[in-house]
């Protein structure tokens, strides 16, 4: 682990160091990649700690139960591992595969303004995408109200072909077939 100022501008979060595992510096790691082991294809990792940005090198990793554990270079005991708990893991976005047409990384969708329909079928601002999560059937967008949205409601809108009509990353907007009263 080394302090760094060379954090990629195009970085994307791919996981988080969750908790210490054992006495030899291993950590449980949460992965945002699919499959979860893909996070080890994108190295080096940059982690954001209380002390600032650090570059970390993965020594070893292994599946354990339903999750993953990792051993990092220069993290050799439980105390060192515990100091990293909660650190987010980032990589250069340029390392990730390009998306196909109508495919998006969640990080590209967060913060987009969501435009839906009112009772008269007029376009209205429903808020901004705050986060996304999986349900098994389809992904769900958590849309939080903003100062200029139609109301103060938080909405959970499914990412489904019948709902999501168009995504305009350049304009920072997503158009949905979703009413104010849903």
Curated annotation (Swiss-Prot):
Q: Principal place where this protein is found?
A: cytoplasm
This entry carries the following GO cellular component terms, namely: cytoplasm; ribosome
Could you tell me the keywords of this UniProt record?
Chaperone, Cytoplasm, Ribosome biogenesis, rRNA processing
The GO terms describing molecular function are: ribosome binding
| Domain annotation PRC barrel: ranges | 101-182
Q: Which SUPFAM superfamilies match?
A: PRC-barrel domain, Translation proteins
Task: Name the Pfam families on file.
Answer: PRC_RimM, RimM
Origin: domain of life: Bacteria
Q: Which residues form a coiled coil?
A: none
By its UniProt entry, which InterPro entries does this protein fall under? PRC_barrel-like_sf, PRC_RimM, RimM, RimM_N, RimM_N_sf, Transl_B-barrel_sf
Keyword rRNA processing annotated: yes
| GO BP annotations listed | ribosomal small subunit biogenesis; rRNA processing
Cell compartments where the protein resides: Cytoplasm
Question: Manganese: present as a keyword of the record?
Answer: no
**How does the entry describe the domains?**
The PRC barrel domain binds ribosomal protein uS19.
Function according to Swiss-Prot or TrEMBL? An accessory protein needed during the final step in the assembly of 30S ribosomal subunit, possibly for assembly of the head region. Essential for efficient processing of 16S rRNA. May be needed both before and after RbfA during the maturation of 16S rRNA. It has affinity for free ribosomal 30S subunits but not for 70S ribosomes.
Family affiliation: Belongs to the RimM family.
- Subunit (UniProt): Binds ribosomal protein uS19.
Q: What is this protein called?
A: Ribosome maturation factor RimM
Q: Which organism is it from?
A: Acinetobacter baylyi (strain ATCC 33305 / BD413 / ADP1)
Gene encoding this polypeptide? rimM
């Amino acid at each position: 682990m080394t302090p760094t100022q060379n954090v990629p501008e195009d970085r994307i979060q791919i996981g988080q160091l969750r908790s210490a595992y054992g006495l030899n510096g291993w950590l449980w790691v949460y992965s945002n990649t699919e499959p979860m082991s893909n996070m080890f294809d994108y190295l080096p990792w940059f982690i954001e700690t209380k002390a600032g940005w650090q570059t970390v090198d993965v020594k070893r990793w292994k599946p354990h139960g339903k999750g993953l554990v990792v051993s990092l270079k220069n993290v050799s005991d439980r105390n060192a591992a515990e100091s990293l708990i909660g650190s987010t893991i980032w990589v250069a976005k340029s390392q990730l595969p390009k998306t196909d047409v109508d495919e998006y990384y969640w990080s590209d969708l967060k913060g987009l303004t969501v435009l839906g329909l009112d009772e008269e079928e007029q376009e209205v601002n429903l808020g901004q995408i705050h986060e996304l999560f999986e349900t098994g059937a389809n992904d769900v967008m958590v849309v939080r109200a903003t100062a200029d949205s139609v109301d103060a409601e938080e909405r959970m809108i499914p990412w489904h072909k019948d709902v999501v009509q168009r995504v305009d990353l350049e304009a920072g907007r997503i158009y949905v077939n979703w009413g104010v009263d849903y």
